[in-house]
Design a protein with these regions (language model features):
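Retroviral integrase
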Residues: 1-109, 134-144, 148-190
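Short, charged, surface-exposed loops that flank catalytic or proteolytic processing sites
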Residues: 113-123
Length: 190
């Protein structure tokens, strides 16, 4: 289990209404990044991951399935060059990467509901990112970036300037069934 944001990421591909998407999710904050793909080759996935890493930083580890995009020599060389520990789920039991599979279903539901309502799916994604995980826990965005994001919802300026969430003051749990201890020793929290 990760002990701070962006330490461990999950990555998967999925199809929605004939389009291919790349979903990258931080295991700690549950922050999802969604990218629509023109191609699902290793080279295309690597370019999207490079773009994400250039913006958010490089994770220590990346969990994927054993799809051809991730099992190529090109992908192995990329992970090695960028210093990323590439972890694959069991080819005999793909559900072993349950976290990312659940997030794929969550994001697919956001896309379906947005389509049905004729709404912008990226606003739905923003809403998901900025909704508190639990009544005592901050949003994925706040856990990851230590700030509240501005959204379409009216909000006082005071709330936009709120203090950063402190990991050491919370019993934040990624998966309550497998982890019940407090997060401490986070070098990324002020």
């Amino acid at each position: 289990m990760p002990s701070f944001p962006w330490q461990k990421l999950g990555c998967d591909l999925f199809d929605h209404q004939g389009a291919q998407y790349l979903l990258v999710v931080d295991y700690y904050s549950k922050y999802p990044i969604l990218m629509k793909l023109n191609s699902t080759t290793s080279a295309a996935i690597i370019n999207h991951l490079k773009s994400i890493y250039a913006e958010y930083g490089t994770p220590e580890s990346l969990v994927t399935d054993n799809g051809p995009q991730y099992s190529s020599r090109e992908f192995a060389a990329f992970c090695n060059h960028w210093g990323i520990n590439h972890i694959t789920s069991s080819p005999l039991y793909p559900k072993s990467n349950g976290f990312i599979e659940r997030m794929v279903q969550t994001v697919k539901n956001l896309l379906k509901k947005s389509d049905a309502a004729g709404q912008d799916p990226y606003l739905a994604l923003l809403s998901y990112r900025t909704t508190p995980i639990d009544r005592n826990l901050p949003s994925p965005a706040k856990v990851l970036s230590q700030r509240d994001y501005r959204t379409q919802l009216p909000c006082s300026g005071r709330l936009q300037r709120s203090r950063p969430w402190n990991v050491t003051k919370s019993n934040y749990s990624i998966d309550k069934t497998s982890r019940n201890s407090s997060m401490t020793g986070n070098p990324h929290v002020n």
